[in-house]
């Protein structure tokens, strides 16, 4: 933003938020005047130009990657990511139209493009920075709705509502930034090589409140409420899951007789509810919203760290001359605000595996893996297999691929993950009628996890007298280095009648493993 509040840095103005004094660029025997250009320090100009040029280039490339990541990946086209794209567009516009001229001003020490372009440039500066702040404000409201109303979020925040919110962001930003172009400013200096800031007191108050302090208050209130709601909801959902597990209403592995399965299914239809409780569904959806809130909380936190020093130094230096910081400190403060434009493209891939994969695919490093994931998403199920665990097997965990199953960006359908194949041992197939098995894999399961059926009643401590089923979750058979039976093993995919979510049922008997 253009520091329209600055009344203390006014001697020879670069058009950005801090004023640069001409005597900083003149020799010891030279004086600044309207007719004399400052002497250029070539060494300093080259070093400053290289540093600022690299910074601007990084901001441009990073924000382009953010925009392309959402545009080229259908599963990233969510309302929350629309706000992220809007933030990237504002930062990209700032990097293209404002930062190069700010860097030129730093290198040369005076404005070279005339009075009219100075006014336009300053207005675009305010426009882009205000749009960034208001986008973060919209993101904080979106995250509060996502955490507070996680199940109703898709109906409360639709694509149409998100687009209307983005249009409102740019309209408000235009209203705040256009004032000086319409004459709401003090008289311009006589020297066109000075690009001063607007010191008109009422516009200074209006722009500072609308561009930073009011949106900042909304952001802080929303994220405080997100923290309170997340803490309370997590506690309640975890308590509900523990209660249902203790009542044996929610089992991740159920082995039962065919008659019992049919009776349970018929009673479930009669009662009109699903034995798989909605508590797990709520917990899974809420965990996704909370994870997104954490990532965007980092974005907001870095924004505050970058811009707050400037908005503290600017009004204090304007109102109280004794509190005015040195020119070198003031330059660092306002360029720290500009530095925020290249931070977000670093935060997203570090905090989100989905954005990291999208960045890598755009850069051409994982195109083949991207095709595999897209094909699996079209099939609607993850190709994970299980095998019986036999006597003498060591209780080890194996990670068959680097991507953990808790990533919501791939191989996810609804609220459960499915295990589409079974591989019984040859010796077990000839045993005759065996109970069917029904498997429901939840996102918390990891490749290599060991799943065991509790001991049958009345046989506690007698592991050799009853069929103790133990299974090991293997990795994706399509992934390199993964082993597993990829045949369907007589399994069929069914649908959860209550929730409309894909489930999995297998009538293929599995081999018991004895320790």
Curated annotation (Swiss-Prot):
Ranges in a coiled coil: none
Segments of skewed composition (Polar residues): 410-424, 484-498
GO BP: any one term: organ growth
Tree of life domain: Eukaryota
Entry-linked SMART domains: 7TM_GPCR_Srsx
Region ranges (Disordered): 392-430, 474-515
Transmembrane stretches, start-end: 46-70, 84-105, 116-141, 162-182, 202-224, 296-319, 327-351
Disulfide topology: 118-195
Topology of the protein relative to the lipid bilayer: Multi-pass membrane protein
Main location: nucleus
Known partners and oligomeric status: Homo- and heterooligomer. Heterooligomerizes with ADRA1B homooligomers in cardiac myocytes. Interacts with CAVIN4.
Function: This alpha-adrenergic receptor mediates its action by association with G proteins that activate a phosphatidylinositol-calcium second messenger system. Its effect is mediated by G(q) and G(11) proteins. Nuclear ADRA1A-ADRA1B heterooligomers regulate phenylephrine (PE)-stimulated ERK signaling in cardiac myocytes.
Protein name as annotated: Alpha-1B adrenergic receptor
Species for this entry: Rattus norvegicus
């Amino acid at each position: 933003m253009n520091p329209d509040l600055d009344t203390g840095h006014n001697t020879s103005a670069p058009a950005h938020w801090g004023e640069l004094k001409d005597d900083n660029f003149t020799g010891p025997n030279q004086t600044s005047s309207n007719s004399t250009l400052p002497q250029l320090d070539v060494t300093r100009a080259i070093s400053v130009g290289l540093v600022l040029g690299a910074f601007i280039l990084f901001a441009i490339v990073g924000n382009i990657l953010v925009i392309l990541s959402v545009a080229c990946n259908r599963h990233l086209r969510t309302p929350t990511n629309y706000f992220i794209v809007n933030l990237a567009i504002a930062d990209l516009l700032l990097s293209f139209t404002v930062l190069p001229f700010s860097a030129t001003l730093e290198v040369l020490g005076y404005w070279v493009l005339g009075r009219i372009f100075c006014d336009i440039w300053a207005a675009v500066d305010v426009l882009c920075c205000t749009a960034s702040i208001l986008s973060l404000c919209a993101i904080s409201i979106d995250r509060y709705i996502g955490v507070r109303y996680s199940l109703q979020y898709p109906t409360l925040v639709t694509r149409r509502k998100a687009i209307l919110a983005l249009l409102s962001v740019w309209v408000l930003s235009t209203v705040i930034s256009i004032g000086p172009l319409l004459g709401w400013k003090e008289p311009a200096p006589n020297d066109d090589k000075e690009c001063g800031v607007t010191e008109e007191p009422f516009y200074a108050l209006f722009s500072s409140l609308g561009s930073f302090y009011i949106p900042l208050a909304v952001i802080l209130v929303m994220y405080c409420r997100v923290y309170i709601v997340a803490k309370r909801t997590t506690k309640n959902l975890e308590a509900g899951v523990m209660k249902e597990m203790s009542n044996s209403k929610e089992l991740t592995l159920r082995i039962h007789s065919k008659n019992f399965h049919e009776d349970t299914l018929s009673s479930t239809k009669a009662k009109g509810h699903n034995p798989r409780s909605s508590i797990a569904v709520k917990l899974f959806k809420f965990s996704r919203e909370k994870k997104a809130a954490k990532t965007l909380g980092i974005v907001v936190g870095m924004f505050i760290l970058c811009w707050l020093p400037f908005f503290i130094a600017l009004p204090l230096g304007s109102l109280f001359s004794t509190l005015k910081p040195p020119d070198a400190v003031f330059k660092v403060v306002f360029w720290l605000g500009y530095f925020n434009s290249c931070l977000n493209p670093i935060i997203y891939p570090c905090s989100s595996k989905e954005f990291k994969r999208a960045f890598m695919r755009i850069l051409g490093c994982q195109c083949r893996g991207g095709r595999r994931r897209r094909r699996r998403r079209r099939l609607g199920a993850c190709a994970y297999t299980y095998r019986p665990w036999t006597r003498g097997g060591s209780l080890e965990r194996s990670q068959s691929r680097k991507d953990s199953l808790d990533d919501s960006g791939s191989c996810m359908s609804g609220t459960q993950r499915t295990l589409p194949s079974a591989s019984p041992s040859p010796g077990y197939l000839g045993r005759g009628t065996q109970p069917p098995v029904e498997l429901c894999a939840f996102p918390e399961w990891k490749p290599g996890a060991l799943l065991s059926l509790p001991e049958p009643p009345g046989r506690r401590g007698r592991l050799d007298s009853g069929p103790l089923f133990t299974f090991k979750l293997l990795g994706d058979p399509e992934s390199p280095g993964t082993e597993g039976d990829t045949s369907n093993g007589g399994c069929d995919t069914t649908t959860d009648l209550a929730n409309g979510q894909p489930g999995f049922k297998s009538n293929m008997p599995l081999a018991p493993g004895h320790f």
